[in-house]
From Swiss-Prot:
Gene Ontology CC: one annotated term: endosome membrane
Modified residues (Phosphoserine): 286, 290, 370, 373, 465, 470, 595, 604, 612
Signal sequence bounds: 1-25
Domain called Protein kinase: residue spans: 289-576
Protein name: BRASSINOSTEROID INSENSITIVE 1-associated receptor kinase 1
Gene3D superfamilies: Phosphorylase Kinase, domain 1, Ribonuclease Inhibitor, Transferase(Phosphotransferase) domain 1
Tissue-by-tissue expression: Expressed ubiquitously.
Outcome reported for the amino acid change (mutating residue 30 to Y): No effect on flg22 induced FLS2-BAK1 heterodimerization
Result for mutant: residue 46 to E: Loss of binding to BRI1 and loss of kinase activity
Origin organism lineage: Eukaryota, Viridiplantae, Streptophyta, Embryophyta, Tracheophyta
Disruption outcome: Semi-dwarfed phenotype, altered leaf morphology and reduced sensitivity to brassinolide and flagellin. Enhanced chlorosis and lesion formation upon pathogen infection. Bak1 and bkk1 double mutants are seedling lethal. Impaired SCOOP12-mediated growth inhibition. Partially compromised SCOOP10- and SCOOP12-induced root growth inhibition and reactive oxygen species (ROS) production; fully compromised in the double mutant bak1-5 serk4.
Length: 615
């Protein structure tokens, strides 16, 4: 009898525990479900948001921590419309709320002020209206606040000045009114953060007072004038010869040499969150740009490791392009625009140095180097990149590039996407570097740039033939970078000729796929520790990105969705059908079609005569 009673009690205990787990686990899921129900989703981006699941951690575009608590919601550029909901304030561990570039209307909920862990709030390029909630001043960890290109009105809440962690602020293109705060965190921001609003412009700094010169007798003036004239003549003779000699020496010296100037000619100022360093400060940090501190060199110049006075490690990129007169203001403007591109997967520009003869950019130091160095130049004591890390690198770098293409105004085309330009932070998170430099180095040109900047093996065929780059140029380079991640090999390697293989990595991979040799192309350092289906999916994304026609390549935002598991199968099936049609009717090849891998011949033939800049 007792045993019979124990069974139903045990059964009910399980049900109660299950109910408790579901209720606690679904608290955050309910908040996100409320958001889903408030939004129109024509592209079915939120289709996986199933409210019956225990937690939302398996949903697309949602990231959780090890405790199954939501830390990130990525719904930028998702073609969503509707309104935000107050339940968003019930995500206690949320760090990133990315809802930019949609058609969201209504007001910003005051409850967002409850998100005390929030680091980034990106609601720009929507149609939000009403005031900026003063409750956002509670977000003491907020670093990035971008509300630009909406219809927000009213005054800027003074509570925001107390958010001392704030590094990036963009309130531009909103009908905001009133005064711009100048205290607290707002003391760092420049007019670019408040452009095209109805805010009262910041007052210009008054010029320093000029001390009046006391009058002197006429006779004294004549004597003083005579003495001054004699001194001036003597000084002219004294400095004429050295000045002529210096001018002659500069003309004879190669134009790509750098001249050091005193730090006094480059006073330290701040441009928003961007610091302007003195040349002397960077000379000391890098031991006068010593060769022993060189981290790398490439088409834009050399990169030096440096240690600032406070002990912070930095990477100093010393640009090598010839300078032209009058380009300082444009260079400074471009640098500030680059600094506004802030994303978890983009290398943050910390500061710069500009003198009449020098252009230097200062970045955080990345202790784990680049993907290329981890794949091919790691010391024996360092373990190879495992497969999960490579997957994270693929997704992180795609997110960074998608941000450059879709959410920077004007958009930034990288023009040299490769493993050497994907850096790794302390957690081996991918950080895209060297973006914006191609345009920065062309700042003195007033015409369309036709010089091809890039690296052999990564250059898209249309960019090579026309000199015109686009987002799809970057997509091609990204696809080749994925193949580097999978194979561990270089995009262009003459050593493959020894085995009668293609020197171009893309062609080599296609050849192996046609021969059904999938295992032969996977990096041997992985030692078989990967899932075949995951490798195949990453190869599929790479091949879609490296199609000959730029029109047929996906956008980087589409690549992100495919890597997150949304739409790859359909896109791949469609491409396979098109390839089969081409091979059957238009472009017969010597290779038989392989079931599951129908690969067309590469058309990206790049001659060796084109310059390459290994980084």
């Amino acid at each position: 009898m007792e045993r019979r009673l124990m069974i139903p009690c045990f059964f009910w205990l399980i049900l109660v525990l299950d109910l408790v787990l579901r209720v606690s686990g679904n608290a955050e899921g309910d908040a996100l479900s409320a958001l889903k129900n408030s939004l129109a989703d024509p592209n079915k981006v939120l289709q996986s948001w199933d409210a019956t699941l225990v937690t939302p951690c398996t949903w697309f575009h949602v990231t959780c921590n090890s405790d199954n608590s939501v830390t990130r919601v990525d719904l930028g550029n998702a073609n969503l419309s509707g309104q935000l909901v107050m339940q968003l304030g019930q995500l206690p561990n949320l760090q990133y709320l990315e809802l930019y570039s949609n058609n969201i209307t209504g007001t910003i909920p005051e409850q967002l002020g409850n998100l005390t862990e929030l680091v980034s709030l990106d609601l720009y390029l929507n149609n939000l209206s009403g005031p900026i909630p003063s409750t956002l001043g509670r977000l003491k960890k907020l670093r990035f606040l971008r509300l630009n290109n909406n219809s927000l009105s009213g005054e800027i809440p003074r509570s925001l000045t107390a958010v001392l962690t704030l590094q990036v602020l963009d309130l531009s293109n909103n009908p905001l009114t009133g005064d711009i705060p100048v205290n607290g965190s707002f003391s760092l921001f420049t007019p670019i953060s408040f452009a095209n609003t109805k805010l009262t412009p910041l007052p210009a700094s008054p010029p320093p007072p000029i001390s009046p010169t006391p009058p002197s007798p006429a006779g004294s003036n004549r004597i003083t004038g005579a003495i001054a004239g004699g001194v001036a003549a003597g000084a002219a003779l004294l400095f004429a010869v050295p000045a002529i000699a210096l001018a002659w020496w500069r003309r004879k010296k190669p134009q790509d040499h750098f001249f050091d100037v005193p730090a006094e000619e480059d006073p330290e100022v701040h441009l928003g969150q961007l610091k302007r360093f003195s040349l002397r400060e960077l000379q000391v940090a890098s031991d006068n740009f010593s060769n022993k501190n060189i981290l790398g060199r490439g088409g834009f110049g050399k990169v030096y490791k440096g240690r600032l006075a406070d002990g912070t490690l930095v990477a100093v990129k010393r640009l090598k392009e010839e300078r032209t007169q009058g380009g300082e203001l444009q260079f400074q403007t471009e640098v500030e625009m680059i600094s506004m591109a802030v994303h978890r997967n983009l290398l943050r520009l910390r500061g710069f140095c500009m003198t009449p003869t020098e252009r230097l950019l200062v970045y955080p130091y990345m202790a784990n180097g680049s993907v290329a160095s981890c794949l091919r130049e790691r010391p024996e004591s360092q373990p190879p990149l495992d497969w999960p890390k490579r997957q994270r690198i693929a997704l992180g770098s795609a997110r960074g590039l998608a941000y450059l293409h879709d959410h920077c105004d004007p958009k930034i085309i990288h023009r040299d996407v490769k493993a050497a330009n994907i850096l790794l932070d302390e957690e081996f998170e991918a950080v895209v570097g060297d973006f914006g430099l191609a345009k920065l180095m062309d700042y003195k040109d007033t015409h369309v740039t036709t010089a091809v900047r890039g690296t052999i093996g990564h250059i898209a065929p249309e960019y090579l033939s026309t000199g015109k780059s686009s987002e799809k140029t970057d997509v091609f380079g990204y696809g080749v970078m994925l193949l580097e991640l999978i194979t561990g090999q270089r995009a262009f390697d003459l050593a493959r000729l020894a085995n009668d293989d293609d020197v171009m990595l893309l062609d080599w991979v296609k050849g192996l796929l046609k021969e059904k040799k999938l295992e032969a192309l996977v990096d041997v350092d992985l030692q078989g520790n990967y899932k075949d289906e995951e490798v195949e999916q990453l190869i599929q994304v790479a091949l879609l990105c490296t199609q000959s026609s730029p029109m047929e390549r996906p956008k980087m935002s589409e690549v992100v969705r495919m890597l997150e598991g949304d739409g790859l199968a359909e896109r791949w099936e469609e491409w396979q059908k098109e390839e089969m049609f081409r091979q059957d009717f238009n472009y017969p090849t010597h290779h038989p079609a392989v079931s599951g891998w129908i690969i067309g011949d590469s058309t990206s033939q790049i001659e060796n005569e084109y310059p390459s800049g290994p980084r």
